[in-house]
Amino acid sequence: MGNIEGGADTVLDALMDYFSQGLLLLPTHTWAQMGEEYRVFDPVKEDACVGILPNLFRKRPGVCRSLHPTHSMAAYGAGAEEYIAGEEENNTPCTPGGCYDRLKDINGRILLVGVTHARNTFIHGVEEVLNIPNRLTEKPVEFYTVMPDGSRKKIFMRRHYNAVQPYISEDFVKLTQAFYDTGAARQVLFGNAECILCDARGIFEVTRHILAPDPECIITSPEIPASRWSDFTGGPYFHV
């Protein structure tokens, strides 16, 4: 983003002011540390593994954090608590009907700041909705979430896994041109940072269109040809 007076706190101040009448969501994932050897998630104490902004944001007044043990979100603004409610019941990283999936239903936008679609967790959610094979572990992990009253809630959760590509999301970049060509995403600047602004509904519809004839093409194909989306008729997703 370049040199910003006040650093990360200034960025958060601007975002929270802009979204004061809307809903601001930041990922506060803990998948990097949660696993077979570390299975208790305390949403108050546990740092996120996805950068400084989420960790500062989750501690701010008025911000609430979902209770998902590996893929939590922090929320601020209108309907924040309602939006993240119930995530402690989910048994996959991006369960259909969960916080990630519902972005497409609330006209949500996703801003990828200085990163590519390899960090676009929403696409994991699309794959879960479409029930793409070979994306989750067969055996679930037993996690415990510390609830607001101090009790511990047990959940058995499957995690992201593919035997061919251990880092599934690294191949999401193969969809980049499809998203640009169909208008589901556009390049923007946030400060000096090159960013990708995505329409959640558009990302869902384009990904579904491409995966329908070949559900595993993101991993099995070296690249995805434009012919796979040239007949797509959805959108427009951005009106300004």
Model-derived regions, located:
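N-terminal and secondary-structure boundary signal
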Residues: 1-240
